[in-house]
Amino acid sequence: MTLVLASASPRRRALLAVLGIPFVVDPAAIDEPLPERHSHPERIARALARHKATVVAARRPGDWVLAADTVVVFRGRLLGKPESAEEAHAMLRLLRGRWHRVITAVALARGRRRWVDHTTTWVLMRQYSDEDITASIARGEPFDKAGGYAIQDPDLRPVESWRGCYCNVVGLSIWLTWRLLQQAGFPVSTPDERTLPPVCQQCPLAPAEVTSRTANRE
């Protein structure tokens, strides 16, 4: 029984590894055009994640294929991965000091079966400077990330606070993925808390057994 991650993202690989499940990587490699402004962002993320999983499942019959898609939404506008320095600069200026939503959908495919779920995290950006933005662009940070930033970036430190799942903003909610695998009947156990990042132990999506043990230790 093989679990396949349909993503080339090193961040998603690292997050999935936290669950302690052996997996292989087989990226879907599809075009991801952003729909019109009035499209429903949750539906977009779910449809793209499902499509990625379906593409890879078609060439891997019998395997379990996991895919994800992340969209960043600011006042109804979907922000993709910037394609130029100018676009990255404009995105980061737009988000600076403001709240926005990050939606990540996770899809699992095996044969003709599909399981899809998503979660939303609200993110408040800090008041970084124009010089901070320029330095981030010079390092090449924005160009492979929806919205042009990484919440975990130690240099830009773009985020002041968030509400919801932290790993969802990184690109794959660990607990949403864990729950989806369980619902589909894939054999997965609760991760060893010693290997869980602190943000995952305190995540609002974490199972009660994890959050209660964390609270007791405190």
From Swiss-Prot:
The record marks R11, T70, Q152 as: Important for substrate specificity. The keyword Lipoprotein does not apply. Keywords: Cytoplasm, Hydrolase, Nucleotide metabolism. It is found in: Cytoplasm. Pfam families: Maf. The active site is at D69 (proton acceptor). Nucleoside triphosphate pyrophosphatase that hydrolyzes dTTP and UTP. May have a dual role in cell division arrest and in preventing the incorporation of modified nucleotides into cellular nucleic acids. NCBIfam families: maf. Belongs to the Maf family. YhdE subfamily. PANTHER family: BIFUNCTIONAL DTTP/UTP PYROPHOSPHATASE/METHYLTRANSFERASE PROTEIN-RELATED (PTHR43213), BIFUNCTIONAL DTTP_UTP PYROPHOSPHATASE_METHYLTRANSFERASE PROTEIN-RELATED (PTHR43213:SF5). This is dTTP/UTP pyrophosphatase. It comes from Thermomicrobium roseum (strain ATCC 27502 / DSM 5159 / P-2).
